[in-house]
A protein has these predicted regions:
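Short, surface-exposed alpha-helical segments at coil->helix boundaries
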Residues: 53, 57, 61, 127, ...
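Bacterial N-terminal signal peptides that target proteins for export
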Residues: 1-7
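Structural recognition of the beta-strand scaffold that forms the well-ordered cores
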Residues: 35-38, 71-73, 115-118, 147-150, ...
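Contiguous ligand/interfacial binding patches
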Residues: 151-168, 172-190, 198-199
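C-terminal motif of bacterial Sec signal peptides marking the signal peptidase cleavage site
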Residues: 15-18
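Helix-loop-strand module that forms the ligand-binding subsite of alpha/beta enzymes
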Residues: 82-170
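N-terminal beta1-alpha1-beta2 submodule of the flavodoxin-like/Rossmannoid cofactor-binding fold
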Residues: 20-113, 190-200
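Solvent-exposed loop/turn segments at secondary-structure junctions
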Residues: 41-44, 76-80, 121-125, 152-157, ...
Length: 200
C-alpha cells in the first residue's frame, strides 16, 4: 500500500511538472518569434562619459537574454570617435534636414511576429540612421507587433512611438518603454518588469 501511494504521488508530480512546462512554453511563445532591432552609440555619452558598450545595446542584450530574441544592430561608422557636443550638433542638423545616413548589413523581417525597436533619443526622436532602416522596411511589418523602447537622460519616449507608427502603417505599435541611460547597467530589474508586463 505504501509503495502504491508513492507511485501515485510520483505520477501526479510528473503530470503537474509537465503541465507547468507546457504553460510556460505557451507564455514564452504567445508573442511569436521576436527580434530586437536597435541602434546604440558607444564612446562619449551624456551622463555616463566614455563607454565601450552603448546604453541601448545593454537593454537590447537584456531583452535577448530574458526572452531569447534574435538581434539586428543598426551600425553606422559616421559617429565613430566623436565627442558628445559635436555629435549632438551633427544629430541636430541631420534631424532638421531629414538626412538618412547609411547603415551596414540588413535583416529579413518576414520570419518575425514581434519586433522590438530601440535607440537613444536624439533631438526628440530616434537617431536619423534608424529612419533609414524604417524607410527601407516600411512595408515589411504590416500586421506585426512593434514594441518601441528608448534610452534617454530626461526625454522619455519623446516622439519615438509616434514616429514608429508613422513609419510602419498597418503594424500594431505598443505604447513603449523608456529607461535612463545612466541606469541601464544597474537596473536590469526594470527591463524584466516591463517584459513581464508584456506577457513574457
Amino acid at each position: 500500500m505504501k509503495l502504491k501511494s508513492i507511485i501515485i504521488a510520483t505520477v501526479g508530480l510528473l503530470l503537474a511538472t509537465g503541465c507547468n512546462s507546457q504553460n510556460k512554453q505557451v507564455k514564452q511563445t504567445n508573442m511569436g518569434k521576436s527580434i530586437v532591432i536597435f541602434f546604440s552609440h558607444a564612446g562619449d555619452n551624456y551622463a555616463v562619459g566614455n563607454i565601450e558598450v552603448g546604453n541601448t545595446k545593454i537593454v537590447a542584450d537584456y531583452i535577448s537574454e530574458i526572452i531569447g530574441t534574435d538581434q539586428f544592430e543598426i551600425v553606422t561608422h559616421k559617429y565613430d570617435g566623436m565627442a558628445y557636443a559635436p555629435l549632438i550638433n551633427l544629430a541636430k542638423e541631420e534631424t532638421r534636414k531629414g538626412e538618412l545616413p547609411e547603415y551596414e548589413g540588413d535583416v529579413d523581417l518576414s520570419q518575425y511576429d514581434t519586433v522590438f525597436i530601440g535607440g537613444p533619443v536624439w533631438w526628440g526622436t530616434y537617431p536619423q540612421v534608424m529612419f533609414t532602416f524604417f524607410k527601407k522596411h516600411a512595408n515589411d511589418l504590416k500586421g506585426k507587433t512593434i514594441i518601441p523602447f528608448t534610452t534617454h537622460e530626461g526625454s522619455g519616449l519623446a516622439n519615438c512611438v509616434e514616429d514608429v507608427k508613422a513609419a510602419f502603417a498597418g503594424a500594431n505599435v505598443t505604447k513603449g518603454f523608456s529607461i535612463y541611460g545612466h541606469e541601464v547597467r544597474t537596473e536590469k530589474t526594470k527591463v524584466e518588469k516591463w517584459l513581464k508586463g508584456l506577457g513574457y
